[in-house]
A protein has these predicted regions:
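Alpha-helix/helix-capping structural signal
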Residues: 69-72, 98-99, 176-177, 218
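Adenylate-forming
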Residues: 1-5, 17, 30, 53-55, ...
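Active-site glycine-centered loops adjacent to acidic/histidine catalytic or metal-binding residues
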Residues: 97, 121, 144, 203, ...
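Gly/Ser/Thr-rich phosphate-binding loop
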Residues: 36-39, 61-66, 75-139, 151, ...
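AMP-binding/adenylate-forming catalytic core of the ANL superfamily
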Residues: 54, 64, 152, 158-161, ...
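Adenylate-forming AMP-binding core of the ANL superfamily, especially NRPS adenylation
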Residues: 99, 131, 138-184, 192
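Conserved AMP-binding/adenylation subdomain of ANL enzymes
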Residues: 1-20, 24-62, 77
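Beta-strand->loop->alpha-helix junctions that form or flank phosphate-binding loops
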Residues: 117-124, 144-145, 251-254, 298
Length: 325
């Protein structure tokens, strides 16, 4: 049955899978299950952008599971390096783990073709939303529609359903009634639910008239400055396109008058003329409403992204909040 399912999803054709991420994560681990269907797996000891292209060509790789950080590193390869390798065997790249910037995914589709499948969810519950490249090109930035047994709902602070294109808390209703279960943590499991089988993974989102979900931020990452809700993802999506920025994260830090304010933490690119923090903030303000932009900016060496491309913003915030009651 598993093999039949794999063949059905792949149009009756299967081939080698490239595993580029750690197998303790549900994405790469789920890929190795295709061994049951007779699909061979090529496992990389650690991710390297050019070696990934080399493996695709050498082994005729059919599919892989990646995260947006892998995409960014692949796109950073010089054009002459990209041109060296034949990637025409690739038929499917699923991506998960973190939100993918629109420009990054668009560039990957232009390079690899419409082979991408965004699978949004969590290890504790599986995939809750999915979107093909074709649907994504019509709805750029979306993580797709809810997949059975889940129904997506956007709720306000009183847990009322919100109309289309209105931002709120993203919940899923599980038709099986199971919901999300955190291992050995019944309190956390209970806190994620507002009713049996109705749970959240902690995201802020909106849903259009067709049911496509667009994630904008996380509850825990939201910054409240002077009573105004600020979403770090917005300035992050602007600053990541500055030519001197390699990576960026925005967090809330203490402010005596406003309660907290936005701070950008930027990893600069090497061999670039580095502008001052003030110049970079001004650059952001030219492209985004002033109140949504960071008030301060620090250059850092590391943001602590894990192997699946996620940042623990609680750890990033901690030094700034130490001693603040």
């Amino acid at each position: 049955n598993f093999k039949a399912g794999v063949l059905e999803r792949s149009g009756g054709v299967i081939g080698p899978q490239l595993v580029v991420g750690p197998m303790y994560h549900t994405g790469p681990l789920s890929g190795t299950r295709q061994l049951i269907a007779g699909v061979s797996s090529v496992i990389m000891a650690r991710f390297n952008a050019e070696k990934t292209l080399e493996a695709i060509q050498e082994h005729g790789i059919f599919s892989s599971i990646m995260v947006p950080t892998h995409f960014v590193r692949l796109l950073a390869l010089p054009d002459d390096v990209r041109a060296k390798y034949d990637i025409s065997s690739i038929r499917s790249i699923s991506h998960t783990g973190a939100k993918c910037p629109v420009d990054v995914k668009r560039e990957m589709i232009e390079w690899f073709g419409p082979v991408f499948l965004d699978a949004y969810g969590a290890s504790k519950v599986g995939t809750t939303c999915m979107i093909t490249s074709e649907d994504w090109l019509r709805n750029p930035g979306s993580v797709g529609k809810a997949v059975p047994p889940f129904t997506a709902r956007i709720l306000d602070d009183d847990n009322n359903d919100l109309p289309a294109n209105t931002e709120g808390k993203l919940y899923f209703e599980d038709a099986t009634g199971r919901g999300v279960i955190y291992h050995n943590d019944p309190e956390k499991s209970a806190a994620a639910h507002i009713a049996p089988g109705v749970f959240t993974l902690g995201e802020i989102a909106y849903m259009n008239e067709e049911g496509f979900v667009f994630i904008t931020d996380r509850f825990s990452d939201m910054v409240v400055s002077g009573g105004v809700n600020l979403y770090p993802a917005e300035p992050e999506q602007v600053l990541i396109h500055h030519p001197a920025v390699l990576d960026v994260a925005c967090i809330g830090v203490p402010h005596k008058e406003m309660g907290e304010e936005l701070k950008a933490l930027v990893i600069p690119k090497e061999d670039m003329d580095l502008p001052s923090p003030e110049v970079m903030i001004a650059w952001c303000r030219e492209r985004l409403s002033h109140y949504k932009c960071p008030r301060t900016l620090d250059f850092v060496d590391d943001l602590g992204r894990n192997t699946m491309g996620k940042i623990n913003k609680r750890k990033l915030r901690a030094p700034y909040w130490e001693g603040v009651s």
